[in-house]
């Protein structure tokens, strides 16, 4: 069973990957590995955001929240 994804840690890890890749000090192989990990983290972060958006929508529907505005996508 895999660990539960931590969104905040995912963002921190993405920032570290970006800094490492922008430094220009990585070999081609390391750059590809970092890029691959970054893509996976991006997918996990997006999935976590989608789940949060769905939960917010569900909760506001249950409470008949009438002032709901759609969330903006980045």
UniProtKB/Swiss-Prot annotation:
E.C. numbers: 3.1.11.6
InterPro entries, per database record: Exonuc_VII_S, Exonuc_VII_ssu_sf
One Gene Ontology molecular-function label: exodeoxyribonuclease VII activity
Superkingdom of origin organism: Bacteria
Record's GO cellular component terms: cytosol; exodeoxyribonuclease VII complex
Pfam family of the protein (one): Exonuc_VII_S
The keyword Cytoplasm appears for this protein: yes
Sorted UniProt keywords: Cytoplasm, Exonuclease, Hydrolase, Nuclease
Primary location class: cytoplasm
Location(s), subcellular: Cytoplasm
Catalytic activity: Exonucleolytic cleavage in either 5'- to 3'- or 3'- to 5'-direction to yield nucleoside 5'-phosphates
Gene3D superfamilies assigned: Exonuclease VII, small subunit
Example GO biological process: DNA catabolic process
NCBIfam families with a match to the protein in the record: PRK00977.1-4 (NF002140), xseB (TIGR01280)
HAMAP family named among the record's database cross-references: Exonuc_7_S
Function text: Bidirectionally degrades single-stranded DNA into large acid-insoluble oligonucleotides, which are then degraded further into small acid-soluble oligonucleotides.
Protein family per UniProt: Belongs to the XseB family.
Oligomeric and partner information: Heterooligomer composed of large and small subunits.
Protein name: Exodeoxyribonuclease 7 small subunit
Organism, as annotated: Vesicomyosocius okutanii subsp. Calyptogena okutanii (strain HA)
Lineage summary: Bacteria, Pseudomonadati, Pseudomonadota, Gammaproteobacteria, Candidatus Pseudothioglobaceae
């Amino acid at each position: 069973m895999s660990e539960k994804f931590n969104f905040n840690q995912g963002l921190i890890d993405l920032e570290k990957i970006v800094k490492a890749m922008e430094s220009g000090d990585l070999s081609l192989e390391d750059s590809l590995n970092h890029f691959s990990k970054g893509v996976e983290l991006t997918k996990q972060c997006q999935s976590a955001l989608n789940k949060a958006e769905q939960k917010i929508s569900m909760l506001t529907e249950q409470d008949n929240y009438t002032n709901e505005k759609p969330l903006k996508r980045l």
